[in-house]
Amino acid sequence: MKIKIAARGSKLSLKQVSMFTSYLLKFFPDLEYEVITVKTTGDKANAPFEELAKRGLTGLFEKEVNKAVLEGKADVAVHSLKDLPTELDPRLEIAAFLPRDPPYDVLISRAGNYDIFDLPKGSVVGTSSARRKALIKNLRPDLVVKDLRGNVDTRLEKLRRGEYDAIVLAEAGVSRLGLNVDYVRLDWRLFPPSPGQGIIVAVTRKGSEISDLLKSISDVKSEKLATAERTVLKEFGGGCFVALGAIAFEEGSLIRLRATVLSPSGRERVDVELIGKGPEEVGMRAAERLKALNPMKTTVGSEE
């Protein structure tokens, strides 16, 4: 059996495809595959993400990749789960969740191993994520937050050139690329990650042969935790453009979920933490609590 795998052409995306195929071949060593790279709207966009979101261009990094699956040009699309909207095309589904890599955000600074609280006043910190921007402003209103675009290598080069004093990235991306950089992991209680961060997923056509195949090897723990986190996002509203963080952990047979929503300025912040049995149930309860306590309106900004 041979399958065609669609993904973005970035170094990180192709590394994620490599991780997916390695995982797949553990179960199906005779499987053959072909990788199809797709140039996406998000890759080609030059405008700030907030502006793109206002135009309704959500799902910037997955739309054309999934289109290849819908059109039959590929059997599977490989994504970082945090880039996927909570609502997929009804003809598609997430068939497999890989074991989770570290879900946390990290701070990389020019001056050394600084935590966010160690940065000097007025330091310029780079990110284009609404969640990260709001969290930085909440924790350190004396810092300057500046948009940061490009792939991981480009972002690190901009840091080295002195355009920023520090940048915030997903630890999973840094780890997957095997980058030799010093960083400080940000406390998830203060700096909660994007829902689903650290998880690679495979999207397929519903009811397809490959969908059934992948479901048989999906990581149960990853799927459970991702479902809890993404249910908060879905029920609260706003997709991957809302300033919302969530992280879930297994505690025996239960799930502990912490979720945070912030105003764009970071001045208003609501944190909730709940324990429940079912991932959807605990996610829905967390979203309801956030809605009840939320005194502000949220805004847009990419999670890439």
UniProtKB/Swiss-Prot annotation:
Its family remark reads: Belongs to the HMBS family.
Q: Which domain of life is it from?
A: Archaea
The cofactor note reads: Binds 1 dipyrromethane group covalently.
Q: Which species is this UniProt entry from?
A: Ignicoccus hospitalis (strain KIN4/I / DSM 18386 / JCM 14125)
Q: What is its EC number?
A: 2.5.1.61
Summary of the function given for this chain in its UniProt record = Tetrapolymerization of the monopyrrole PBG into the hydroxymethylbilane pre-uroporphyrinogen in several discrete steps.
Something else the entry says is:
The porphobilinogen subunits are added to the dipyrromethane group.
Coiled-coil ranges (or none): none
Protein's name according to its UniProt entry: Probable porphobilinogen deaminase
